[in-house]
C-alpha cells in the first residue's frame, strides 16, 4: 500500500488539485485506489464504494471537491505512469498501453495526446533527442 503523503506528488496534476485530493478522505481513498491499480481496469463503482457513496453521488462529489472529474484523474495518472516508461525504456507502444490499463494502443495514444499534446512516439523521440 502507498504512503498517503506520497500518493499525489504528480508532475501532471496542478498543485491545488493535489492538495484537494489529499484534504478530503473520500477523494484520497479513491485516488489511492487508482494509483495502486493503475495497470488494471479502474471502475468508478469501486472508487465510489471505497468512498462510501453511490457512483452518481461520488462522481459529483469528486468533481466538486477536486475540480476535475474522476475519469480525468484516471487518464492523467495513467499517462503520468506511461511517461516514465517512455523516458527510461524502449518497447512497443502497444505493450505500454496494456501496462497502463488501456485496452488498445489507439485509445492509449488518443489519451496520451489529449494530456500531453503529442503522441507517445513523438514524446519518446523528443526525450531521446534531449539526451
Question: Across the structure, where does each feature detected by a protein language model lie?
Answer:
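Short, basic, alpha-helical segments at the C-terminal edge of helix-turn-helix-like DNA-binding modules
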Residues: 74-84, 122-131
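Basic/polar phosphate-binding segments, predominantly the helix-turn-helix DNA-binding elements
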Residues: 4-18, 33-35, 40-77, 91, ...
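DNA major-groove recognition helices of helix-turn-helix
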Residues: 30, 65, 82
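Intrinsic structural disorder/low-complexity segments
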Residues: 16, 29, 127-129
Amino acid at each position: 500500500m502507498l504512503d498517503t503523503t506520497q500518493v499525489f506528488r504528480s508532475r501532471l496534476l496542478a498543485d491545488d488539485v493535489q492538495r484537494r485530493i489529499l484534504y478530503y478522505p473520500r477523494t484520497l481513498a479513491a485516488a489511492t485506489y487508482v494509483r495502486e491499480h493503475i495497470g488494471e481496469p479502474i471502475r468508478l463503482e469501486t472508487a465510489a464504494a471505497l468512498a462510501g457513496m453511490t457512483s452518481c453521488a461520488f462522481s459529483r462529489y469528486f468533481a466538486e471537491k477536486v475540480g476535475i472529474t474522476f475519469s480525468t484523474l484516471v487518464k492523467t495518472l495513467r499517462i503520468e505512469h506511461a511517461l516514465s516508461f517512455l523516458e527510461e525504456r524502449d518497447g512497443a507502444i502497444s505493450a505500454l498501453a496494456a501496462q497502463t490499463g488501456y485496452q488498445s494502443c489507439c485509445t492509449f495514444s488518443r489519451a496520451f495526446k489529449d494530456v500531453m499534446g503529442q503522441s507517445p512516439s513523438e514524446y519518446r523521440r523528443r526525450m531521446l533527442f534531449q539526451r
